[in-house]
Each structure stands twice: as C-alpha cells, then as structure tokens.
C-alpha cells in the first residue's frame, strides 16, 4: 500500500463539511470522516471504494 495510507486522518481547520474516507492502519479498514476543505493529506478519498482499492489488503 502507498505510504500516504498510513498518515493520520486530518480533517483540516477550514469551515467546509465534505464527506470523505480515510484508511486506518489500526483496523485495516476505511472509515468516514468530515473534511473541512483545506489542509488535509493524502489519506483522504472521495469514496470508500477508492479508499479500499488503494489502501486495504
């Protein structure tokens, strides 16, 4: 899996509310979170399918 999958979830400090998904190394699963729209990182996906395809297994 790409190294960015291991980055911590980072919602960011802005005021937007965007549904996103991140990979958790601890659970080896993708989970939903609310992204603020800025200053996130590479461990952020638009769909759970994209997250799973990139980071799980």
UniProtKB/Swiss-Prot annotation:
InterPro entries in the cross-refs: Kunitz_BPTI, Kunitz_BPTI_sf, Prtase_inh_Kunz-CS, TFPI/VKTCI-like
Keyword Secreted: yes
SUPFAM superfamilies: BPTI-like
GO cellular component: extracellular space
Pfam families according to UniProt: Kunitz_BPTI (PF00014)
Keyword rRNA-binding: no
Disulfide bonds: 5-55, 14-38, 30-51
Segments passing through the bilayer: none
Keywords attached to this entry: Disulfide bond, G-protein coupled receptor impairing toxin, Secreted, Toxin
Domain BPTI/Kunitz inhibitor: 5-55
Main location: secreted
Localisation: Secreted
Tissue specificity remark: Expressed by the venom gland.
Molecular function terms from GO: serine-type endopeptidase inhibitor activity; toxin activity
Domain notes: Exploits its two major loops and engages more positions in its interaction with V2R. The pharmacophore defined by numerous amino acids positioned in loop 1 (9 to 18) and loop 2 (34, 39 and 44) may be at the origin of the absolute selectivity of this protein for V2R.
Known function: Interacts with vasopressin V2 receptor (V2R/AVPR2), probably in a selective manner. Inhibits vasopressin binding human V2R in the nanomolar range (Ki=3.50 nM), and also potently inhibits vasopressin-induced cAMP production (IC(50)=21 nM). In vivo, intraperitoneal injection of this protein into rats increases diuresis by 6-fold, without any loss of electrolytes.
Family membership: Belongs to the venom Kunitz-type family.
Name assigned to this protein: Mambaquaretin-5
């Amino acid at each position: 899996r790409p190294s960015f999958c291991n980055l911590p979830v980072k919602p960011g400090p802005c005021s937007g509310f965007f549904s996103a998904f991140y990979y958790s190394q601890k659970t080896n699963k993708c989970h939903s979170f609310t992204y603020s729209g800025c200053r996130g990182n590479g461990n952020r996906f638009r769909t759970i399918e994209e997250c799973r395809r990139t980071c799980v297994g």
